[in-house]
């Protein structure tokens, strides 16, 4: 019994061991199946590579150099037909037949077994990759540029009033088309093509071959401003600087034109800044709202240059298909193209269709609202421009009125001064009346309205020329009696002729005051000169002229003044 139970236990143990071996074999079988699948996949890939390399490549023959040979290459006989020599021919190779699948599987199994060969099967060598052709030293030909349209700019003939606006327009055009003007010579030639007359002759003579201005565009602009610098009348410069607007021109050209015209004006810095801001474009004016107050015009121009530099920095390009976050209903280009095309699917339920139509209506409303806002902004801009134009016209009218008032005030002051001088003359006459008024010659009589009235100074000079023909009267101050020889004593002449009075002297210089305290001043022979009356402004004008009267003092009366000769009073 004990032997039977021992055998049974041993059989059971053997059965368990066999089952374990069976399970191990099943696992190995599964692993082999996986390896077989991978091997078949590699076989398929290798089959594709083999089929692509069926045509064997021609072997590379080494290049023979003449210095490495004992004889010249020219002594070699030329082989007809372009065939290679026998030594240079590649060994004959048979065309490979199609490899069977069983052979490939056996090769892979031998490779996977540890006793099999370790070397992989020989495969055809792929040809070396074709080297790219060497890059040529010459630059690639550039596509031809489109012909440049000539701008509609009035030619410059040399008038300095139009120089600022002319240069501003041309500098902006050249800056916008820099591709067509790569060098300074092209820019100088293009600028000269808009000159006419004397300006063109001067520019051609200055920019000849070998001249430093031939290819130096900035220096040529400076020479133009020096040559045609003016002068410009202040009134003309004021009108030109008010008409100067930046528009689409660059800031640098606008600033140069403004400073060129400002040098002919006597405005203060605050007024220049206000006028500079009026001519700026709307973009710069909006940006300057956030900046502080500028000290002078130069600081304002530098601030505008800094704003322009920030704007010219390239901005990142938005990714396509990304919806605007700020305005989620803003139109996208893809939606605008397919706006009219609507597709309805049968599977789309009613709620989804309703949501899609609602979003589409919202987009349309947003577009209409944005369009209305743009139209309102344009209308406001037009109104602001009209208001600015009206204000400028009113300012010009006010300035003209002020100038007229100032001129009228100056005229009134001159008239009042003339009247006051006439009254002073009458007072200085001491109330003495002339013995008789001379009759006016009909030839010299002038009527108001028939002949144009001469200026006051010219009329006075003419009257003085007429009076120069009258003989001067000499008085002896030491005698109080009148006589035919009282004015002709030797001590009064001293062998000298009377002085000649220039006609350009004013009447105030020839005025004779009352000689009080001197003997003989109230004598019967002394009388006031005659009055000369003429027609003038407002029908009558009274002009008083006196002949020059010279007095001589004796040494007893004159003292130290008698040594000087005649004393003119």
Curated annotation (Swiss-Prot):
Coiled coil: none annotated. Residues 115-151, 323-506 are annotated as: Disordered. Residues 372-392, 401-415 have a biased composition (Basic and acidic residues). Residues 334-350, 416-429, 443-469 have a biased composition (Acidic residues). Signal peptide: none annotated. RTL5 is one of at least 11 genes called Mar or Mart related to long terminal repeat retrotransposons. They do not correspond to functional retrotransposons, but rather to neofunctionalized retrotransposons genes. PANTHER family: LDOC1 RELATED, RETROTRANSPOSON GAG-LIKE PROTEIN 5. This is Retrotransposon Gag-like protein 5. The gene is RTL5.
